């Protein structure tokens, strides 16, 4: 969380729109450990407000990121579409990916040059 705060203060906090999709999917799950608690707000509103408050910059998903997301599957064997788009966005944008996802952490641990992460 320190890294998020530091990037926020520096004006260099970036977010993928895939994060909104991931939040939406996660909140639709039943009582699962680690499920996000966004209160009664719809995810879209919560995400929009979070972007506004943090002044994060949204990185649009363009062709290069989409192609890289497909390559993530080939390179890592990981087939979760959201994770692949998040990793592709970080790789193409040359940014660290903030995550607590165990599989993404394994991928980054196996080859730190492939993906830079910040564990939260």
Show where each model-derived region lies.
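Short, polar loop motifs at secondary-structure junctions
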Residues: 100-104
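PIN-domain endoribonuclease scaffold, especially VapC-family toxins
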Residues: 1-79, 84-96, 106-118
């Amino acid at each position: 969380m320190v890294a998020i705060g530091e990037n926020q203060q520096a004006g260099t906090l970036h977010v993928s729109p895939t994060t909104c999709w991931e939040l939406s999917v996660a909140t639709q799950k039943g009582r699962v450990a680690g499920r996000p608690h966004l209160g009664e707000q719809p995810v879209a509103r919560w995400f929009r407000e979070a972007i506004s408050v943090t002044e994060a910059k949204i990185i649009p998903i363009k062709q290069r990121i989409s192609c890289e997301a497909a390559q993530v599957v080939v390179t890592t064997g990981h087939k979760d579409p959201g994770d692949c788009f998040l990793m592709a966005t970080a790789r193409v944008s040359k940014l660290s990916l903030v995550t607590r996802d165990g599989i993404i952490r394994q991928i980054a641990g196996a080859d730190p040059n492939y993906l830079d992460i910040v564990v939260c």
